[in-house]
């Protein structure tokens, strides 16, 4: 073996062992050269578990594998750790994909993986299982009939045929396909074994049943022979207790999966099923089916592990079942390997850590072959260590792969990519670090010289392990030419730079402490001396954070008058601006800093630790802790309240009335009983009121008897033999307790004894007392008070009201009608003589409608007529009139009937010409012929109006034309409609204009045959 060693050149050797043991050595330029930027295979697609249906007509199956690599990778496949014979006609490769023609279960079922390799190494894909799916038919034998007494539970066994895989779904046919059983609380189909369970059999269950099995993996379904079910009638069905027959077992679930538990019970009556997690709340993702028999937990997590219980219960008894869900976890990376380059001869610890449940084990592959187990450490690496590595973390539930390429670097020192700075500046009295960072592998040894003098470590000079040179307490004599030498077993190199000594930067005018009040301005001075050959900048920081003058220019401003002056102006200072300000004067060589404190006096900060104690009906005790006084003593505290009925905070009355600044407890008084409150505390000093504390938790004061009487007590009116009493309900804040209501008291005006009734609805303000013996329009005294569970409140002032008057007893006479059109009828009548009439009501309904659906029109007692509108054309209507007052309506008049007229013509007049003649327009239209169900045309109405307005001049004519004046300015609209006994028909319109024409020309002739409007001027 020969090794090429070039000084100042990089040698990267990538060694790969792939199936046969070949070794490649590659030589590179400085780092990875332009002509060689290769890398080992990186998988982009890997094979997955595949189920091939045995009855498939496709005749082939594909396992995919694709990797990215430079140069392009070569692919191989292995099955059950043996090479796949790609020379066989049964196998072919499409890219990296393996295609198996005419798959055979005996030959092809097994575990496959793909190998991708190039001259950098080889990687192995994840393993994939190729299996063959099938679902055999049910046996051809007939199923025996099943006889069950009504009211008893029963199970029909599915007994599915041989199959793979196990992900079957089950349904049951009733009598014929595709009539499937609907699951409910009484009937259940287990998706675990396929059995049909009926909690108690009914006569309606009679029929022939077949188990219908589907395999979604191979898209095949089969069904069993039909099982006759014959319920045996019972004179009386006996109840029996719940008996759980579908029981879930302990489950091992993988985190992130969906878990289904089944629980079903027989019993009469049908048992109710309840689910719970023992000693813990149910998972938030849990769902229970409508029937209650299925519990599904979606996206199960580790914290969902535990014991789950289902309980079935009916009136005769209950049954319970418990089992545990164990939640396991697929491996997941905590830390994995990545492509790495290391120096030859160095050590490498390659961390590869995974979590999972159970805890995964770690094993390693190198170039596709087993290499190591557990933690991987390489010592004194050589070229033989280069290659493609794979870290595999696996537990019971699967494996995850992390792939990486390890390259070994061998390089003589070179400064070509990173030479020393030609000029290094350092301040007198300061410290400088001169970097020396050549590329080299293995790591070189470093030495330094100044001019012709070799440097060694001393109290001022230190050569770092990475080659950097540190000089402390710099003097003018330290200036000069410095050279760094680097040497390893592959060569040596050096680089030179010049150290220039500058004057140090010094703060000559430092900021001083300041004390201001909120809203005032403050100035922080700062000036510095520095080397005139350098540029000086000032940086201000506040409490350790650099001030951004662009974002914070509202409050911060710098003085740029002199280069050596970095004065800071703080404008309109707020409490948040109090703290330590640091001025840093800096050049590219060094810096100097000085600090000062700014005190901002202002209103106090918010009190803390607010607590509510000793809650009573109208007061509560509060305690709190002092907040910041912001450099001005707190003089007093204010307690504020907010009720559930308001969004506004209000100052509360307190005991003591004035809460001194040294107090940390007080009572809020004069509160509303049985009211929800929040409280907060505000501190005040000579500079103002501060921020409020965080509001307390909402509390409710104790209840108390009402102390406010209802207002606006009155009433009267209503129906016959009624006394209506009204009041203004008390608002929620005056309820003062639970079970709030009203006590209504009333008596005849000259009576002695008050009658009292209780109204329990707190929101009502009305009570109606009915008494058939009550005389109409009788005076009563009434009063109202509120009550709650704590007692009664005061009565309101006594009000005097009258009981309801009697409804009118006379019916209107001389009722008549006049049919106005197809949609309107006018009704008139003679007034009744009774004085108690307040209004008249007209009831009307079409002959084809029921009287109960009658429409009503109400008019005042002064009216003698009313108009009924929006009626149907050519329709018979029945009409009656009654006199009314607040007690109701009296007897109706004799019912009369009327027929609306036929509908007006639906055909609009067709305007055939609009001719200008001198100072007038002549508009002509065709005669409108009414249909058989329409009113005969009796004439025409013409509306002449300005365009855009609704009002104008209305003309009536029996002719088919009309003359209208030429508009003086603007456009006018001429609307023409037919008129009939049934009303006005549909409108036609034409626009005319008074604008002059350029010459006598066509101006206004409508050619009827072609629908063309042409104009003529004479």
From Swiss-Prot:
Top-level lineage group: Eukaryota
Propeptide: 994-1018
GO cellular component: axon; extracellular exosome; glutamatergic synapse; membrane; plasma membrane; postsynaptic membrane; presynaptic membrane; side of membrane
Cross-referenced PROSITE patterns: FN3, IG_LIKE
GO biological process, one term: axon guidance
Residues with lipid group (GPI-anchor amidated serine): 993
Annotated segments matching region Disordered: 693-717
Disulfide bonds: 65-114, 158-211, 263-310, 352-391, 436-484, 526-583
Domain Fibronectin type-III: 606-704, 709-806, 811-906, 907-1000
Classification via CDD domains: FN3 (cd00063), Ig2_Contactin-2-like (cd05727), Ig5_Contactin-1 (cd05852), Ig6_Contactin (cd04970), IgI_1_Contactin-1 (cd05849), IgI_3_Contactin-1 (cd05851)
Tissue expression from the record: Strongly expressed in brain and in neuroblastoma and retinoblastoma cell lines. Lower levels of expression in lung, pancreas, kidney and skeletal muscle.
UniProt xrefs under InterPro entries: Contactin-1_2_Ig1, Contactin-1_Ig1, Contactin-1_Ig3, Contactin-1_Ig6, FN3_dom, FN3_sf, Ig-like_dom, Ig-like_dom_sf
Keyword Disulfide bond carried by entry: yes
Function of the protein: Contactins mediate cell surface interactions during nervous system development. Involved in the formation of paranodal axo-glial junctions in myelinated peripheral nerves and in the signaling between axons and myelinating glial cells via its association with CNTNAP1. Participates in oligodendrocytes generation by acting as a ligand of NOTCH1. Its association with NOTCH1 promotes NOTCH1 activation through the released notch intracellular domain (NICD) and subsequent translocation to the nucleus. Interaction with TNR induces a repulsion of neurons and an inhibition of neurite outgrowth.
Record text on subunit structure and interactions: Monomer. Interacts with CNTNAP1 in cis form. Binds to the carbonic-anhydrase like domain of PTPRZ1. Interacts with NOTCH1 and TNR. Detected in a complex with NRCAM and PTPRB. Interacts with TASOR.
Protein family membership: Belongs to the immunoglobulin superfamily. Contactin family.
Protein name: Contactin-1
């Amino acid at each position: 073996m020969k090794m090429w060693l070039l000084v100042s050149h990089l040698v990267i050797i990538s060694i790969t062992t792939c199936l046969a043991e070949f070794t490649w050595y590659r030589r590179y330029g400085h780092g990875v050269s332009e002509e060689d930027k290769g890398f080992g295979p990186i998988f982009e697609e890997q094979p997955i578990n595949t189920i091939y249906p045995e009855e498939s007509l496709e005749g082939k199956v594909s396992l995919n594998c694709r990797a990215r690599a430079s140069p392009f990778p070569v692919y191989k496949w292995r099955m059950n750790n043996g090479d796949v014979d790609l020379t066989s006609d049964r196998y072919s490769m499409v890219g990296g994909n393996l295609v198996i023609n005419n798959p055979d279960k005996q030959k092809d079922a097994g575990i496959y993986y793909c190998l991708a390799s190039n001259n950098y190494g080889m990687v192995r894909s994840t393993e994939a299982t190729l299996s063959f799916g099938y679902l055999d038919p049910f046996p051809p034998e007939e199923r025996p009939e099943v006889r069950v007494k009504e009211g008893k539970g029963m199970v029909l066994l599915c007994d599915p045929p041989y199959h793979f895989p196990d992900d079957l779904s089950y349904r049951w046919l009733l009598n014929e396909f595709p009539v499937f059983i609907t699951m409910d609380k009484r009937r259940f189909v287990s998706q675990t074994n396929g059995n049909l369970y009926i909690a108690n059999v009914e006569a309606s269950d009679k029929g022939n049943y077949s188990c219908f099995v589907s395999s979604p993996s191979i898209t095949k379904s089969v069904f069993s022979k039909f099982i006759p079910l014959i319920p045996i009638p019972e004179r009386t069905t006996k109840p029996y207790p719940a008996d759980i027959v579908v029981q879930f077992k302990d489950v091992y679930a993988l985190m992130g999966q969906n878990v289904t538990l089944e629980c079903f019970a027989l019993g009469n009556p049908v048992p109710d099923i309840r689910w719970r997690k023992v000693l813990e709340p149910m998972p938030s993702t849990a769902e229970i089916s409508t029937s209650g028999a299925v519990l599904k937990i979606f996206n199960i997590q580790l914290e969902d592990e535990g014991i789950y219980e289902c309980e079935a219960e009916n009136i005769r008894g209950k049954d319970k079942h418990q089992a545990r869900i164990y939640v396991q976890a697929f491996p997941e990376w905590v830390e994995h390997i990545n492509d790495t380059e290391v120096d030859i001869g160095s050590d490498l610890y390659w961390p590869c850590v995974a979590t999972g449940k159970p805890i995964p084990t770690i094993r390693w592959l190198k170039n596709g072959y087993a290499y190591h187990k557990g933690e991987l450490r390489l010592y004194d690496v050589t070229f033989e260590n280069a290659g493609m590595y794979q870290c595999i973390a696996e537990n019971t539930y699967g494996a995850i792969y992390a792939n990486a390429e390890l390259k070994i670097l061998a390089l003589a020192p070179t400064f070509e990519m990173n030479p020393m700075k030609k000029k290094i500046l350092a301040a007198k009295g300061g410290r400088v670090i001169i970097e020396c960072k050549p590329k080299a592998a293995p790591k070189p040894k470093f030495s330094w010289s100044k001019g012709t003098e070799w440097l060694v470590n001393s109290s001022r000079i230190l050569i770092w392990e990475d080659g950097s040179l540190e000089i402390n307490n710099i003097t003018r004599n330290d200036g000069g030419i410095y050279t760094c030498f680097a040497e390893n077993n592959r060569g040596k190199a050096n680089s030179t730079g010049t150290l220039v000594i500058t004057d140090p930067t010094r703060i000559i005018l430092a900021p001083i402490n300041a004390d201001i009040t909120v809203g005032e301005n403050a100035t922080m001075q700062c000036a510095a001396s520095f080397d005139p050959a350098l540029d000086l900048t000032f940086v201000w920081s506040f409490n350790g954070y650099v001030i951004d003058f662009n974002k914070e220019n509202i409050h911060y401003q710098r003085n740029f008058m002199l280069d050596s002056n970095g004065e800071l102006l703080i404008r309109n200072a707020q409490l948040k601006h109090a703290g330590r300000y640091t001025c840093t004067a800096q050049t590219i060589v060094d810096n100097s800093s000085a600090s000062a404190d700014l005190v901002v006096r202002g209103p106090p900060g918010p009190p803390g630790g607010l607590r509510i104690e000793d809650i009573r009906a109208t007061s509560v005790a509060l305690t709190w802790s002092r907040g910041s006084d912001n450099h001005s003593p707190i003089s007093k505290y204010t307690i504020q309240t907010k009720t559930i009925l308001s969004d506004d905070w209000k100052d509360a009355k307190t005991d003591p009335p004035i809460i001194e600044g040294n107090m940390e407890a007080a009572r809020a008084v004069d509160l509303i009983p049985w009211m929800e409150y929040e409280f907060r505390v505000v501190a005040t000093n000579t500079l103002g009121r501060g921020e409020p504390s965080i509001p307390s938790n909402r509390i409710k004061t104790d209840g108390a008897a009402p102390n406010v009487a209802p207002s606006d007590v009155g009433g009267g009116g209503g129906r016959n033999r009624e006394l209506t009493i009204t009041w203004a309900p008390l608002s929620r804040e005056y309820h003062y307790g639970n079970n709030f209501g009203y006590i209504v008291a009333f008596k005849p005006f000259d009576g002695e004894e008050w009658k009292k009734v209780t109204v329990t609805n707190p929101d009502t303000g009305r009570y109606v007392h009915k008494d058939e013996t009550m005389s109409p329009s009788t005076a009563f005294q009434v009063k109202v008070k509120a009550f709650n569970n704590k007692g009664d409140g005061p009565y309101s002032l006594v009000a005097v009201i009258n009981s309801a008057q009697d409804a009118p007893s006379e019916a209107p006479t001389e009722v008549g009608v006049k049919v106005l059109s197809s949609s309107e009828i006018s009704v008139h009548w003679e007034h009744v003589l009774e004085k108690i009439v307040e209004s008249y009501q007209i009831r009307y309904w079409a002959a084809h409608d029921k009287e109960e659906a009658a429409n009503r029109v109400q008019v005042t007692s002064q009216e003698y007529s009313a108009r009924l509108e929006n009626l149907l054309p050519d329709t018979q209507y029945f009409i009656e009139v009654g006199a009314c007052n607040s007690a109701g309506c009296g007897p109706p008049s004799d019912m009369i009937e009327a027929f609306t007229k036929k509908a007006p013509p639906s055909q609009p007049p067709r305007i055939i010409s609009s001719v200008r003649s001198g100072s007038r327009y002549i508009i002509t239209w065709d005669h409108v012929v009414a249909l058989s169900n329409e009113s005969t045309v009796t004439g025409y109405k013409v509306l002449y109006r300005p365009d855009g307005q609704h009002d104008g001049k209305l003309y009536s004519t029996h002719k088919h034309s009309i003359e209208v004046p030429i508009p003086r300015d603007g456009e006018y609209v001429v609307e023409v409609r037919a008129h009939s006994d049934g009303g006005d028909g549909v409108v036609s319109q034409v626009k005319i204009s008074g604008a002059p024409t350029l010459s006598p020309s066509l101006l206004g002739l409508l050619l009827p045959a072609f629908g063309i409007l042409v104009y003529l001027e004479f």
